[in-house]
């Protein structure tokens, strides 16, 4: 009888464990070539935590996972993500398509070692769902995952508005699900032979959840806080997390034209560029910003955005109801060229051949009728992708959807 009470307690504990099944685990593969992939991974982790879904989300840096097999590092001594970020900082993007194909060919050469390496990692992982927010390596990831976890789902979340085939985002691997942020990407998935059950389409690109928080920010108050005039039209220059040398050329042209304009210039982690701006005298009122997590708030102070046609920058501008001015030419990254087509199709901004035309582009944008049309078109867009993606994950995990 002395053992009966402890035994009953153990049985109660066992019953409680059975009532509360083990927490589902999601592993997200990302890298730091550009800032968008990490941003997507962190946004997913954040929104899932906020929704209290009972999932454990693990972020895995793909570059670190595969470092000793880094295919470009073997050729040049520099990591893939470092090469990419150096190209962006310096504007060395002419011929990027050819470089991209060299990278993809090299990845295919190292296909078997990559699959073996990844399979070894997945054997030590008890994830219930694998998510990739990176391009180029999805065939290797899909094959390795299938070897180790043939009954568990693998999904690629495309962080560009469209794919740049072949072997960029969408692969022929039967076990690859894809999440597309546009009808164009969904069409591309169907064209490669993806079954409809393996294609999910969201209402746009995923953004950080804080873009959706109630915000009563006063644009005029923010301008005053930044030392800008409250009544002047305000543009924002945003060229990714590392800035770009072209920003200096843009401001020089606008400054020389003496347009009735002021600018918020986001230099990101490019402190040298920020120091150059601060060290010059300008006719235009400028507010210079280095790296900041407040871009979403500063956007309230702007009337339009000038930037590179990255999917994240475009999506953030649309979320803040800002028309955009972009350029598209031989220097534009190949995977970002469709983004400019999307802007033209949706009539939400102006696409220039190059930023030497920036003065004319700004004048055109600020014409009252043009600006009003662009604002109406931007306002008509409704992007809820960050909340739609967890519902897709729930489906892939075999869980019920949550009502809105």
Which ranges hold each PLM region?
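Conserved N-terminal ligand/cofactor-binding loop architecture of enzyme catalytic domains
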Residues: 43-125
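A nucleotide-sugar donor-handling region in carbohydrate enzymes
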Residues: 176-234, 239
């Amino acid at each position: 009888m002395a053992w009966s009470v402890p035994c009953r307690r153990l049985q109660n504990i066992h019953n409680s464990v059975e009532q509360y099944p083990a927490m589902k685990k999601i592993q997200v593969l990302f890298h730091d070539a550009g800032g968008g992939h990490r941003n997507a991974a962190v946004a997913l982790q954040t929104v899932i935590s906020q929704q209290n879904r009972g999932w454990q989300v693990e972020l895995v840096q793909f570059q670190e996972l595969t470092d000793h097999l880094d295919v470009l590092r073997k050729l040049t001594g520099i990591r893939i993500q470092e090469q990419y970020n150096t190209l962006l900082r310096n504007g060395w993007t002419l011929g990027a398509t050819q470089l991209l194909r060299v990278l993809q060919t090299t990845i295919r050469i190292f296909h078997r070692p990559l699959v073996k390496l990844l399979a070894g990692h997945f054997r030590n992982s008890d994830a219930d769902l694998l998510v990739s927010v990176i391009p180029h390596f999805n065939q290797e990831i899909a094959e390795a995952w299938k070897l180790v976890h043939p009954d568990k789902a693998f999904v690629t979340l495309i962080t560009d508005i469209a794919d740049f085939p072949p072997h960029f985002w969408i692969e022929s691997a039967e076990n690859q699900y894809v999440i597309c942020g546009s009808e164009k990407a969904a069409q591309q998935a169907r064209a490669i032979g993806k079954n409809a059950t393996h294609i999910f389409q969201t209402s746009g690109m995923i953004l950080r959840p804080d873009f959706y928080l109630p915000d009563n920010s006063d644009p005029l108050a923010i301008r005053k806080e930044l030392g800008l005039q409250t009544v002047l039209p305000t543009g924002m220059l945003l060229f990714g997390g590392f800035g770009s040398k072209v920003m200096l050329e843009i401001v020089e042209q606008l400054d020389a034209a003496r347009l009735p304009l002021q600018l918020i210039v986001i230099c990101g982690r490019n402190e040298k560029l920020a120091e150059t701006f601060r060290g010059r005298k300008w006719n235009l009122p400028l507010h210079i910003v280095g790296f900041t997590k407040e871009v979403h708030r500063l956007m309230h102070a702007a009337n339009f955005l000038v930037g590179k046609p990255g999917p994240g920058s475009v999506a953030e501008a649309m979320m803040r109801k800002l028309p955009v001015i972009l350029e598209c030419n031989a220097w534009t990254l190949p995977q970002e060229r469709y983004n400019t087509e999307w802007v033209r199709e949706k009539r939400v901004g102006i696409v220039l051949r190059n930023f030497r035309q920036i003065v004319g582009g700004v004048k055109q944008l600020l014409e009252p009728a043009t600006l009003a049309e662009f604002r109406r078109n931007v306002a008509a867009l409704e992007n809820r992708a960050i909340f739609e993606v967890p519902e897709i994950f729930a489906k892939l995990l075999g869980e019920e959807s949550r009502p809105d």
